[in-house]
Amino acid sequence: MEPAFPASSAGVQSQSGPEPGAGQQEPPPPATPLRPVASQSRFQVDLVTEGGGGGDGQKGQTAAQPAAAAKDKDRGDGGAAAPSPASPAAAAEPPAAAAEEAKGRFRVNFVDPASDEPPLSSQQQPPPPSSASSAHGGHQPPSESMNGYPQNGDTMMSEGSLHSSGTGAHHYYDTHTNTYYLRTFGHNTIDAVPRIDHYRHTVAQLGEKLIRPSLAELHDELDKEPFEDGYVNGEESSPAEEAVSKHVADNKGVVKFGWIKGVLVRCMLNIWGVMLFIRLSWIVGHAGIGLALLVIGTATVVTTITGLSTSAITTNGFVRGGGAYYLISRSLGPEFGGAIGLIFAFANAVAVAMYVVGFAETVRDLLVEHNALMIDEMSDIRIIGSVTIVVLFGISVAGMEWEAKAQIVLLGILLLAIVNFTVGTFIPANDKRAKGFFNYRGEIFSENFVPDFRDGEDFFSVFAIFFPAATGILAGANISGDLADPQLAIPKGTLLAILITTIVYAGAAVSVGSCIVREATGNLTDAIIPGTVTNCTNVACKLGFNFSSCATNKCSYGLMNDFQVMSLVSGFGPLITAGIFSATLSSALASLVSAPKIFQALCKDNIYPGLHVFSVGYGKNNEPLRGYVLTFFIGLGFILIAELNVIAPIISNFFLASYALINFSVFHASLAKSPGWRPAFRFYNMWISLIGAILCCGVMFVINWWAALLTNVIVLALYIYVTYKKPDVNWGSSTQALTYLNALQHAIRLTGVEDHVKNFRPQCLLMTGAPTSRPALLHLVHAFTKNVGLVVCGHVHTGPRRQALKEISTDQAKYQRWLIKNKMKAFYAPVYAEDLREGTQFLLQAVGLGRMRPNTLVFGFKKDWRQALMKDVENYINAIHDAFDYQYGVVVIRLKEGFNISHLQAQEELCTSQEKSAHPKDIVVNLEHSDADSSKPSSKSVSETNSPAVCQDQKDEEDDGKASTQPLLKKEVKDPSVPLNMTDQKLLQASSQFQKKQGKGTIDVWWLFDDGGLTLLIPYLLTTKKKWKDCKIRVFIGGKINRIDHDRRTMATLLSKFRIDFSDITVLGDMNTKPSKDNITAFEEMIEPFRLHEDDKEQEASEKMKEEEPWRITDNELEIYRMKTYRQIRLNELLRENSGTANLIVMSLPVARKGAVSSALYMAWIETLSKDLPPILLVRGNHQSVLTFYS
């Protein structure tokens, strides 16, 4: 029998040779079976070979299955066991029928990588019920007959493998002769059922990435060669898969937080800052209870909208570390993300200093109160702040787990302080009445409900003071990488934190406004003796105290004057001080942790290349120790300044800029209508998010207008920098989605616009083949289409279909990336066809979208047409005819040295491979190439000889489409002992000549025939470009000798109406003069090999030859077009005489009548017309006007 496919994945050696007999003992399985890596759950396909002519009824077997096992496994009755040779059923089944049944079948074996146990052999595997029953000849109970198998056919899937029974064994399924496994969907095909592991990134945090079968594996013909290593397409443990395994292993033991400890606690601690204890009472005093609640409510509206937007973004896919930077960058792209990420990380680093200085100031006030200053007030702040940040730095470096424990302790202290304040409002305040505290009083509430702004304060200034307290809502999101489930934790924790803290702020505002009067002296002597008549009318007088002296003298107590009102009201004053310490330290600790995490994520993305050193993480939690050190020194520096009144508003604006962009991200993503924008969190609205973004921007200017302007300038500067650097990332941002949507909408809108001559643009289908192989052709066409018209680089792939289609799939991204990297505003369009003509026809008909379709076909001249196969020449000329048929304009460009440098690229690649080889051999490359044939790569003949290598010593580069011609175009020959030959040197220089500034020269336009104006429009467009602007246009036209002046004036008038500048007009009156004999002779010698010479042959022979070789030139044809031939020869003489020194020649392309002029004669005309000249464009429009003098 034929050798079958090896199946190393099963751990069974492949077998070939004669089939063993029925009684032959089965070889034992190897002790250590081969298995795929942990990151694979793959499959293999075994061909079932045709059975031999034996009489035992066996239908053949796979190599992975021993013969004895095959007899038990291969059964044709759908479920019964295969009969043994001795059974009647075996004799009853005809061998021919068995062999016929086996034809065309293949067996799908699935490999479970999750199990460490060796596979069961065929004898060890428990059979299905029908098999067991039949084999043992009797009925067994269901529990026994199903021994080793799941009870239901749909329970075969396990977490480790799609096709594992969960018992640790690998099962091999014959899905065509065994219908048992058809009960479980997905077990009878290599097609994969839907599974989450197929959608993971290469290195996923929640599991391993599995690779589904490719479309080619399902659709292509089955290869006759065995799969390498037993895996489909020879799949092995790739570097990416090894990285997955390593990443999963490294993640063991990582500390992850839930929504309470990770988000809720952090957000509440950051929002409950010192504002709650030392500024809220002052706000109520000025704004009154009513406006104070409005201030809190307005801030809550902004933070709630931002929280909703944050929730929408975080539930639209898996969230990694980086907080606000990650959310914005993955939504709006690297430009906004890079700008915000840097300032947001810096803002958090400086916020550490702000909170620590707030703590130090509180400690300093205690020292002043007890007369215990160390040096002076400012120096004490620096000393206390420095010691504090060192302690906080030690906690953060110790790890997130220790930091989280410290936050829990601080939250406990803070909650005790809030409870202490609440209880204190109910304790009778007999000894505190002189300081303005009277417990809950309706009169005090009524008086304090209305505002009483003083000292130039107003609603907006009070709001500006309060709002920074609400900027802690992203404290949980900032450590998104350390959350167990960010998609659940961030929305739940953030929104709940906003709700709780808002209730506490509002409750505290109402409490202090209901208990304490605005001003109090603190003197018990101001108590009103009952029966005494006073002139005061405020609520304090009604409560027994006359504080009217505060109207003229500065008082120290009351809502307006005392920042320590919370301590006054509380049941135990020192606990409020501890609460202030807790609020400042917890906020400082949260910022100290957030800043390095955000900065690390920013550096990992390599948005700013110089900062990549800070992306390194340490330990199981990937702690950014370098970022901690940087944040420590930034915070320490601002602590030593000890004056944060100037920097504080800028920091608040940095936070608000981040919130504005988060809101805008949701609006932008919703506006783009990307199918990928589908957040699991549904309670958001794109217009509310837009309002939130506008509110954030408004609040920025309310807090401090100059700080808002400075923030916007910094963000804009960073945005421009990142845009200019163009980081090589692709995150599927909403910016890309909206760009697509706008392009789609505008393309559709454009289809309803009728063409107009004033809006004509040359839109070129440029037959470059691989764009890297003809750079000069691409640069020249790009010069007159850049920012004006469309360029599509057509590439016709020929040869074996399967190979060509694979090349197309890889070349599409490769060459489009090369065009972008080389700043070519062009598209790449590959197509598969039998030959160049067919491929060009496909492109002419199909390329483009709506009005964005090519209207001009551009070819490079086929320089080697006389040596090439005439079939290729016929295809080349017919492609030009096809373009005219499709109403395209045609441009044929000729460069004396040629365009095709693919043989130099091939030579470079061979040199590179030679340098990499352990035993380098001398290689000689013999190449024959064409400048026009873009249907296939140049033919190569590679031979190993002892001659010196003809290659340059150049640096090896990966063949990824990134400027692969740049080494050839920019590097000089470094090794003089192996130079390029003279022809290749000239070709190499010519390939880059259109990349240089052309300098002062001329563009000679030979506008011999009116084609609609394309021959004149192209040179005009060239002169508008920077590299060609110093060139002057000279126009040459045909005319009569006796009307030269008249023809010149007529043309000058026409050009002036077209608004086209020119330096000179030349009228050629001797165009129809007979060319020189030498040139005529040269032409005749050139076409001699292509002539039919029918007069020298019998009529039947000549007709047969003409039918077989239609490209040949007949004597009759040559005679009919003799004058046209002479014209081409004469024009070449005039061109060399008048335009031999021009920078560029643009000339009307002669048109050959289809079916009348042979391909060889037409090529000879073009060859004769354009030889021995500077770069020349032979142009023929489609005879529709492209110029107009009407407005």
UniProtKB/Swiss-Prot annotation:
One of its GO terms (biological process) is inorganic cation import across plasma membrane. Residues 734-751 are annotated as: Scissor helix. Residues 142-155 have a biased composition (Polar residues). It comes from the Eukaryota. Activated following phosphorylation by OXSR1/OSR1 and STK39/SPAK. Inhibited by bumetanide. Signal peptide: none annotated. It is found in: Basolateral cell membrane. Belongs to the SLC12A transporter family. Homodimer. Cation-chloride cotransporter which mediates the electroneutral transport of chloride, potassium and/or sodium ions across the membrane. Plays a vital role in the regulation of ionic balance and cell volume. This is Solute carrier family 12 member 2. It comes from Squalus acanthias.
